Design a protein with these regions (language model features):
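Basic, helix-initiating cap at the start of DNA-binding domains
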Residues: 1-30, 34-43, 60-63
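Short hydrophobic/aromatic patch on the recognition helix
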Residues: 45-55
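Alpha-helical DNA-contacting segments of helix-turn-helix folds
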Residues: 62-69, 112
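Helical hydrophobic small-molecule/effector-binding pocket
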Residues: 92-121, 140-145, 171-178, 212
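Short hydrophobic clusters on alpha-helical segments that form packing/core surfaces
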Residues: 19-27, 69, 98, 102
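Hydrophobic/aromatic-rich alpha-helical bundle segments in the mid-to-C-terminal region
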Residues: 109-110, 114, 129, 133, ...
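Hydrophobic alpha-helical connector segments
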Residues: 64, 78-108, 130, 163, ...
Length: 214
């Protein structure tokens, strides 16, 4: 790639990042449902036509934000793994990192939840959707590797079955409980239940399900 081509690519990546920054800011202000592409364009100071060069529609833009969020999450997961020696503590650390991510990046977590509800496009995925899927796949690989390491070091029970199934089960459980505690906090409180206690109970149950018997 020559110098001019590199500059054009850098400019394209910079502008795409600015669009995503703008979309996240608008979403934080008005919510994703109320967000419009025109609002994002104004925030990014781009014409409507140029905005659609980078993202074909609002759903495509959503996947762009999702990819960003998952990349940040993967970084947090990796850091959590590095803080522990045993696989059990590493996978529980990943769970804690997920909880912290949902609280620190509410826009990303909301977008992630929305993407979770959509059918995966295998053949006609946009570049943003494909990149989002790739980041999600990398997270799964990381979790599976930690589970396998935990079985090898004796901290995770060996009879759980396919670690890919276990990883997806843990992901679904953690995501569902965190979302419940976030979106249903007031309803839970009416019944005398603290959403934070629900999350903590989920972590206790996860540990009991995973820990190897001594």
């Amino acid at each position: 790639m020559n110098y001019l081509a590199e500059r054009r690519q850098e400019e394209k990546e910079r502008r795409r990042a600015e669009i995503l920054d703008a979309a996240e800011a608008v979403a934080a202000s008005v919510g994703w449902d109320a967000l419009t592409m025109d609002q994002v364009g104004r925030r990014a100071r781009l014409s409507r036509a140029l905005l659609y060069v980078y993202f074909k529609d609002k759903v495509d833009l959503m996947y762009g934000i999702c990819e960003r969020g998952l990349a940040t999450m993967r970084q947090r997961f990796t850091e959590a793994v590095g803080r522990h020696r045993l696989g059990l503590d590493q996978i529980l650390g990943i769970g804690r990192a997920y909880i912290a991510f949902s609280q620190e990046f509410p826009v990303h977590f909301d977008i992630l939840a929305r993407c979770e509800l959509r059918e995966v496009s295998a053949e006609d995925a946009t570049p943003s959707e494909a990149a989002c899927q790739a980041e999600g796949g990398a997270l799964q690989v990381l979790m599976v590797g930690v589970l396998e390491a935990g079985v090898r070091d004796g901290s995770i029970r060996p009879d759980l079955g396919d670690p890919r199934v276990v990883a997806n089960s843990l992901w679904g459980m953690t995501h569902g409980v965190v979302q419940l505690a976030s979106t249903k906090a007031k309803i839970l409180a009416l019944h005398g239940v603290d959403g934070r206690a629900v999350i903590e109970q989920m972590m206790v149950m996860a540990r009991r399900a995973l820990v190897a018997q001594q």
